[in-house]
Amino acid sequence: MVIKPSVNTTLSGLSANGSVILRHPRWADFDYWVALRKENQTYLQPWEPEWNAKHLTRLSYRSRLGRFKKMVSGGDAYPFHIFRASDDRLIGACNITHIERGVAQSSKLGYWIGEHYARQGFARASVTAACKFCFESLGLHRVEAAVQSDNLASIKVLEHVGFQQEGTARDYLKINGKWQDHVVYAKLSGD
């Protein structure tokens, strides 16, 4: 059964080091989000589009929350912040985007975890929870994720969760100021 989740949707997953909670970004997360982004700017830079200090302003965050609300209410995307369940600490984000209905029934998935929380199973738990949500709640058939070939930690996450490599997309995304090839992975509802 396909449901239309609300902006208050919360997901949970288990990692080797406890559990994670995925919930939609909200205004109360702003200070924690800014601190996490600042703390991890250098760590995440090789894997993300360029961004500057304006990205971390209250105005920018408020605007982002407005866009998120529209995307969720339209069923186009479901952005989530990732929290460590043991202490409700914001540790990353996991976004379900580019939802296509009709004959495609698919979406794209992106995620990041702060360096201090990496390699502890939190990304794996988050991706697992997001896929379950895509297949069981949204009724999607396919979830796609694209990763740079040298992002071995992310590749390991995808493969462990059951994504299969499909090929390479040339100059797929402009990351860190440069067009980058990405390896495309996908997981199907029947996998």
Predicted regions, residues:
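Acyl-donor (CoA/ACP) binding surface of acyl/acetyltransferases
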Residues: 1-32, 36-46, 79-191
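Conserved GNAT-fold acetyl-CoA-binding loop/helix
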Residues: 45-66
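Short loop/turn motifs at secondary-structure junctions and domain boundaries
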Residues: 70-75, 163
